[in-house]
Amino acid sequence: MPKIVDHDKQRLLVAEAAWRIIRRDGMEQASVRNIAEEAGISAGSMRHYFSTQSELLLYAMNLVSERVSNRIKQMSFNGSPMENMKLLLLEFMPNTDEKMAEMEVWFAFTAKSKTDPALKALADKVYDEIRQAIATVITYIVKLNLSRANLNEELEIERLYALVDGLSIHAVLRPDQMTYEIMENALSLHLAALCRAEE
């Protein structure tokens, strides 16, 4: 009797194998042969799951975005407005080992997207979604009348986006210096600085 293979599960296992290679050996080693070996399948059987290497890499890159989106959908926002906003923003930052692994892979894909149109389209879409989430945080602060006087919303969106992105990059490149605690404290201080002083 032929072995029944769960196609979606196998695609996921292959993508996770690609992640491991990218984290351990770099994007240049993420060949079909190397990924197949890491996944424990033959290179020939890879075509049953992905027709091209580009399709595989696009799927693996999109998997990072899907995992972040799924975590956000499952979040319960039960704290204060500031706590809730911080929780949301931390989903885009590598403040756990799991998210650090995802971020390392994401940045490798982002670098490759400079020369791969399909990856670039996905990267642009995801970065636009992150910017929209950050814009929502700034709008929320203003609508709740928490913001300091004369807050320039457009400028503050860019500043907060730069902070989230910059802290994330530093955490990936220098995890010994940009610890999870420092990252979270820097975000908290920035959010507090956006708000008017309590009377």
Where does each model-flagged region fall?
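N-terminal intrinsically disordered/low-complexity leader segments
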Residues: 1-9, 198-199
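Amphipathic alpha-helical packing segments from all-alpha helical-bundle domains
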Residues: 74, 98-107, 117-143, 158, ...
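Helix-loop "lid/cap" segments that line or gate small-molecule binding pockets
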Residues: 90-97, 104-115, 190
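Hydrophobic alpha-helical connector segments
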Residues: 59-62, 73-102, 153-160
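Hydrophobic/aromatic-rich alpha-helical bundle segments in the mid-to-C-terminal region
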Residues: 118-124, 141-194, 198-199
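Residues in soluble alpha-helical coiled-coils and helical-bundle/repeat scaffolds
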Residues: 51-55, 76, 80, 97, ...
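Generic hydrophobic, amphipathic alpha-helix propensity
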Residues: 7-18, 35, 60-64, 68, ...
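Helix-turn-helix
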Residues: 13, 17-55, 59
